[in-house]
Amino acid sequence: MEKITVTLGERSYPITIAKGLFDDPSAFAPLKAGQQVMLVTNQTLAPLYLAKVKATLQQARIRVDEVILPDGEQYKSLSVLNDVFSALLENSHSRDTTLIALGGGVIGDLTGFAAACYQRGVRFIQMPTTLLAQVDSSVGGKTAVNHPFGKNMIGAFYQPASVMVDLNCLQTLPARELSSGLAEVIKYGIILDSAFFSWLEDNMDKLLALDNQAMAHCIRRCCELKAEVVAADEKELSGLRALLNLGHTFGHAIETEMGYGVWLHGEAVSAGMVMAARTAQLIDNFSEQDTQRIIRLLERANLPVHGPQNMPPEAYLPHMMRDKKVIAGKLRLVLPTKIGKADLRSDIEHNCVVDAILQCLPYENV
């Protein structure tokens, strides 16, 4: 069992990483007998994990209600959020309730935002079941739902009480979802840790094969890096946390334009990271050699390195200008400077961005 702390003063919380965690009543120790819990999951995960987690909670004499949502990015919406509120109210959940997000990034983001809003804020616990959620979205308190005009546009910074990573969940993860999570893993190496990037180059085959030792190390290192960044810049005020958005400005444009769920988040971020690398090259701030290292590693993870074939470069910028990093009408992009380091830039001309996107086309739709 591994434990990492996200250090935020009184709001600090643990990330626990272990196999079989969902079967362990002691893992829910902060909850007390008789307390209410609302388990939020989706129709795909409910048959796999809902009964197991409910039984574990009931062993600890915790009162459990559940809400089962449709599965998919397109359901990370205000209307589905309202379904969670309705379930809480119909079951008379009061301010001392705890919401548990049992799922991937969609469930975690939506449940966290529900917790931030319900009766002005209730406790919630992240139980991430996808690699992407385990290494990234479950840690750091970013909660949100999507809007037709943009991804994660309606949300709040709201930290969980704890994050419980059960490595056994990866055994049921579809290959495409595993690759999607690996995009966020690779991102950490590009922006923060060149040694970790090199380790990924040496161990990608083991990760794809779900080697226990390699995967445990990978998840632990990603959570350590994310925890350090969140502790230093929780609400993206200094620019440090914004570096975690490498590839996301391009990637969110792809997700929004193509329709939520057509491209998985990690797939869009993967193509976006190559676009960011090409942009950095065009301003002579990144090497072709490092770009090729990124492309090779993404391809080994079975990820796209080009944008959608039917999305022209001019379709990107309107979405990118709605990005949450835009300030005073200026596009701000996270660009790598070398493997292991990145900068937040606000001086990139739009024609440079378009030229970089052009270099990353075409790609057959997924």
UniProtKB/Swiss-Prot annotation:
It catalyses: 7-phospho-2-dehydro-3-deoxy-D-arabino-heptonate = 3-dehydroquinate + phosphate. The keyword Transmembrane helix does not apply. InterPro entries: Dehydroquinate_synthase, DHQ_synth_AroB, DHQ_synth_fam, DHQS/DOIS_N, DHQS_C. NAD(+) binds at residues 71-76, 105-109, 129-130, 142, 151, 169-172. Its main location: cytoplasm. The keyword NAD applies. GO terms for biological process: amino acid biosynthetic process; aromatic amino acid family biosynthetic process; chorismate biosynthetic process. Pathway: Metabolic intermediate biosynthesis; chorismate biosynthesis; chorismate from D-erythrose 4-phosphate and phosphoenolpyruvate: step 2/7. It is found in: Cytoplasm. Zn(2+) binds at E184, H248, H265. Its EC number is 4.2.3.4. Binds 1 divalent metal cation per subunit. Can use either Co(2+) or Zn(2+). Its cofactor is NAD(+); Co(2+); Zn(2+). One of its GO terms (molecular function) is 3-dehydroquinate synthase activity. It is an enzyme of class 4 (lyase). GO terms for cellular component: cytoplasm. Keywords: Amino-acid biosynthesis, Aromatic amino acid biosynthesis, Cobalt, Cytoplasm, Lyase, Metal-binding, NAD, Nucleotide-binding, Zinc. Catalyzes the conversion of 3-deoxy-D-arabino-heptulosonate 7-phosphate (DAHP) to dehydroquinate (DHQ). PANTHER family: 3-DEHYDROQUINATE SYNTHASE, 3-DEHYDROQUINATE SYNTHASE, CHLOROPLASTIC. Belongs to the sugar phosphate cyclases superfamily. Dehydroquinate synthase family. This is 3-dehydroquinate synthase. It comes from Photorhabdus laumondii subsp. laumondii (strain DSM 15139 / CIP 105565 / TT01). The lineage of its organism: Bacteria, Pseudomonadati, Pseudomonadota, Gammaproteobacteria, Enterobacterales.
